[in-house]
């Protein structure tokens, strides 16, 4: 007598697998949502701290310009690629047997990032005053000098922000959501703490 396949056990297994997958998606979405909310709140605190310690002065404008330029490069490169390209590519190699290829791809992207962005940073350091003038919108000469000085300090962040974007895509593909979800929140928290601790002694 031939045994009949146990479809009920297969259906039960499929249901449990689907339930686990949906629970994982819900958990990941919750972590990302909490990270975004905390980041927004800390962003508001950051702006309040800057206004409190420096007021509506040219110093705030100088800092805003110097900090936004690295963010422009991040949004243009790694920030824009994470959801569109990096996560799908990384996810296709996320299985344990493909981890070697995953590390090779990550290493290649980080190396490519250094090769492309290092000359950009160097040129930015050389022409910081000209860049500050282009994006300043009619600042005074003194504020323009401060902007150029701050820009030379913040330009290397172009490299680190894009590194963080690539590694965030890697962590998302490996289903590790906490660190990349709170990445922006930690960035804003760092600015808040530095403003509170060093505003009076170091200024902007």
Regions found by a protein language model. Give the residues of each.
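Membrane-embedded alpha-helical bundles of multi-pass transporters/translocases
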Residues: 2-204
């Amino acid at each position: 007598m031939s045994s009949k396949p146990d479809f009920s056990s297969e259906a039960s297994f499929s249901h449990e697998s689907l339930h686990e997958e949906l629970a994982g998606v819900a958990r990941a979405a919750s972590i990302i949502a909490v990270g975004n909310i905390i980041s927004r709140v800390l962003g508001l605190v950051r702006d309040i701290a800057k206004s409190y310690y420096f007021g509506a002065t040219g110093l705030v404008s100088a800092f805003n310009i110097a900090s936004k330029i690295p963010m422009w490069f991040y949004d243009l490169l790694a920030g824009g690629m994470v959801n569109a390209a990096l996560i799908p590519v990384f996810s296709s190699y996320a299985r344990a047997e493909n981890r070697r290829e995953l590390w090779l791809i990550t290493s290649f992207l980080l190396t490519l990032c250094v090769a492309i962005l290092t000359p950009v940073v160097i040129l930015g350091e050389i022409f910081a005053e000209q860049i500050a003038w282009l994006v300043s919108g009619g600042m005074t000469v003194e504020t323009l000098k401060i902007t150029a000085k701050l820009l030379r300090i913040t330009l290397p962040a172009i490299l680190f922000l894009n590194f963080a974007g690539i590694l965030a895509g890697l962590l998302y593909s490996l289903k590790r959501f906490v660190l990349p979800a709170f990445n922006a929140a930690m960035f804003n928290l760092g600015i808040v703490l530095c403003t509170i601790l060093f505003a009076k002694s170091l200024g902007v």
